[in-house]
């Protein structure tokens, strides 16, 4: 199991520079705010950091803050077992992805292969991760209205 520790980001969606969120202060975190305040952007940023895609299908060109338009940066720190991992993304015209384990660079030669390594470390696919990490009313309703077979399949996939 992984534990998300810290998320830092600059210029993603409606956010500017210098955002820092400690994710392991509590076992469950609820983000509350009015519409348009950036609540749903946080899990999307986490998905981008770990899987290079997001559950809303937002294109890469639409992720940078449109008022700054200077690319974006994401750093996500997480642990698995006794190891501390850090994923750093710097995207302007191209993407630079760096993966560290306990301070040592274990990135592959390409961003695609580095993301494959990240998924191997996490041990769950994108869909399962998104359903576990990001609960909104639609996602909760999907599980509740799913057939018994599909609910069972989802729960078995967690094991």
Where are these regions (language model features)?
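Extreme N-terminal "head/tail" segments of very large remodeling/mechanoenzyme assemblies
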Residues: 1-106
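Extended, charged alpha-helical "arm/stalk" segments used for dimerization and assembly
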Residues: 26-29, 37, 82-159
